[in-house]
C-alpha cells in the first residue's frame, strides 16, 4: 500500500488513511512531525519470483517554519525499509521523497528535490488500491511519479481568486548515467531535461477533473549508446498526456484516468533480452470503493497499458502491439481505527503469457496480497 505523503502546503500529495502524524516539535512558528507505517505483507502466487514475504516500513519527517506573515518554509523526507531479507543481505532500502521549499501566501509554493511528477496529479485519482495501485507507471520514469531533480511551482485556488482551481508548473533536470550526471543510474531510470504542467478543478458536489502533460529529452543510452544497442523505442523526446475525473461524496468514490505517451512507457529490465520503451502507449485506470460506517471498504479496480508499435527487439523479433499491464483488482480494507487496518487485494492478471512476456520478464500470474498495517 502506498503511503500518500502530504507535502506541507502542497496539497496535490495525499495522505493515505486517516492516521495523523506524531508531532515532535511545535514552538515559535516551527513545526516538525513524524509519520510512517509498518505493513506486514505477504503475496500468494504461483510465480515463485513474486510469492512470499513483502513486508516493509515507511517513515518520514515533515516540517515548516514561519518566516513572515506571507512566507513559510517547508521540507519533507520519506524513507522505505524493506523487512523481507536476511540481516546480512542488502534490503534495497531507499529514499522515496526529499525536498525543501517556500510558500508565498496566495502566490503559491516552490520546492526542489526528489518529489512527485506532475502527471501523478492525475494518476492519484485512481492510485488507491491498498497494494496493486498505480501499476501503469513507476518511480523514476520521467515525470509520471516519484523522481529526482524536480523543481515545482504550485498554486491553489488560482492566486486566491477561483476556489478549487489549482495548477502546477514543473521542470526536471537531467538524470543520466555516471558519465553524464553525478547520480548515474540504470538506463530505464534515466531522463533528460524536461518540463510539465498540471491543472485540476473541483466543480463541487464531489466532482473533480484534472489534466497534465510532460515533455522530456531522452538520454543517449535510451537511444542505444554505451552497450544498449538492443534497447527498444528510440526517440529524442518522451511525452505524456493525461486526463482524469473523480467523484468523492456520500461514502462513494469513483475515478478514471487515461494517459497517452510516446517513448515513455517502459517494459522489461536492462538485463532481460527484451526491454525499452513503447513508441506509443495508452494507459487506462479505473477505481471504485464504498466506505461503510463500521470500517469496511470494498473496492474494485482496472489497470491497462497497451504498448503500440513496439518494433524489432535485439533478438530479431518484431513484437508489434502488446499488453504491458492488464489486470482486474478486487478486494477490501477493514479499518479497526485510524491507526490500524488490514486488507486483501486480489490481482487478476489478464496479460497473456507469450514470447514477449517471457523475454521481457513480465509476470502473467495472479497474485493475492494480504496485509496488516499500523500507521501513524
From Swiss-Prot:
**What InterPro entries does this protein's entry cite?**
Gram-neg_bact_OMP, Gram_neg_porin_domain, Porin_dom_sf, Porin_gammaproteobac, Porin_Gram-ve, Porin_Gram-ve_CS
Span of the secretion signal? Answer: 1-21
Q: How is the protein disposed in the membrane?
A: Multi-pass membrane protein
Q: Where in the cell is it found?
A: Cell outer membrane
Example of a GO biological process term: monoatomic ion transmembrane transport
CC terms in the record's Gene Ontology section: cell outer membrane; pore complex
Report keywords, A-Z. Cell outer membrane, Ion transport, Membrane, Porin, Signal, Transmembrane, Transmembrane beta strand, Transport
Under Pfam families, the record lists: Porin_1
Molecular-function GO term, any one: porin activity
Q: What is its main location?
A: membrane
Q: Which domain of life is it from?
A: Bacteria
Subunit structure as annotated in this protein's UniProt entry:
Homotrimer.
The family note in this entry says: Belongs to the Gram-negative porin family.
The job of this chain, per UniProt, is described as: Forms pores that allow passive diffusion of small molecules across the outer membrane.
NCBIfam families, A to Z:
PRK10554.1
The name of this protein is Outer membrane porin C
Species of the source: Serratia marcescens
Amino acid at each position: 500500500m502506498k503511503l500518500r505523503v502530504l507535502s506541507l502546503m502542497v496539497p496535490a500529495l495525499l495522505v493515505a488513511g486517516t492516521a495523523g502524524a506524531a508531532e515532535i516539535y511545535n514552538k515559535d512558528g516551527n513545526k516538525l512531525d513524524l509519520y510512517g507505517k509498518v505493513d506486514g505483507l505477504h503475496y500468494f502466487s504461483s510465480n515463485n519470483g513474486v510469492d512470499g514475504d513483502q513486508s516493509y516500513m515507511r517513515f518520514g519527517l515533515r516540517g515548516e517554519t514561519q518566516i513572515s506573515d506571507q512566507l513559510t518554509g517547508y521540507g519533507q523526507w520519506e524513507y522505505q525499509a524493506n523487512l523481507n531479507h536476511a540481516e546480512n543481505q542488502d534490503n534495497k532500502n531507499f529514499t522515496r521523497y526529499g525536498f525543501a521549499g517556500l510558500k508565498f501566501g496566495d502566490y503559491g509554493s516552490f520546492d526542489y528535490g526528489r518529489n512527485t511528477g506532475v502527471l501523478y496529479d492525475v494518476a492519484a485519482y485512481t492510485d488507491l488500491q491498498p497494494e496493486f495501485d498505480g501499476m501503469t507507471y513507476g518511480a523514476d520514469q520521467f515525470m509520471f511519479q516519484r523522481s529526482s531533480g524536480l523543481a515545482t511551482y504550485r498554486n491553489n485556488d488560482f492566486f486566491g481568486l477561483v476556489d478549487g482551481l489549482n495548477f502546477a508548473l514543473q521542470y526536471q533536470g537531467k538524470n543520466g548515467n555516471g558519465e553524464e550526471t553525478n547520480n548515474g543510474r540504470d538506463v530505464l531510470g534515466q531522463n533528460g531535461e524536461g518540463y510539465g504542467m498540471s491543472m485540476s478543478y473541483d466543480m463541487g458536489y464531489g466532482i473533480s477533473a484534472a489534466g497534465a502533460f510532460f515533455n522530456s529529452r531522452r538520454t543517449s543510452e535510451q537511444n542505444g549508446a554505451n552497450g544498449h544497442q538492443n534497447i527498444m523505442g528510440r526517440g529524442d523526446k518522451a511525452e505524456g498526456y493525461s486526463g482524469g475525473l473523480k467523484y468523492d461524496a456520500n461514502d462513494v468514490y469513483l475515478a478514471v484516468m487515461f494517459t497517452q505517451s510516446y517513448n515513455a512507457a517502459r517494459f522489461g529490465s536492462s538485463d532481460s533480452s527484451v526491454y525499452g520503451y513503447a513508441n506509443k502507449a495508452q494507459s487506462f485506470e479505473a477505481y471504485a470503493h464504498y466506505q461503510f460506517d463500521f470500517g469496511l471498504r470494498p473496492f474494485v479496480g482496472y489497470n491497462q497499458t497497451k504498448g503500440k508499435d513496439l518494433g524489432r527487439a535485439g533478438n530479431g523479433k518484431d513484437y508489434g502491439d502488446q499488453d504491458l499491464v492488464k489486470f482486474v483488482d478486487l478486494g477490501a480494507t477493514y479499518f479497526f481505527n485510524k491507526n490500524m487496518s488490514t486488507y486483501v487485494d486480489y490481482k487478476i492478471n489478464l496479460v497473456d503469457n507469450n514470447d514477449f512476456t517471457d523475454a521481457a520478464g513480465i509476470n502473467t500470474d495472479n497474485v493475492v496480497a494480504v496485509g496488516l498495517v499500523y500507521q501513524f
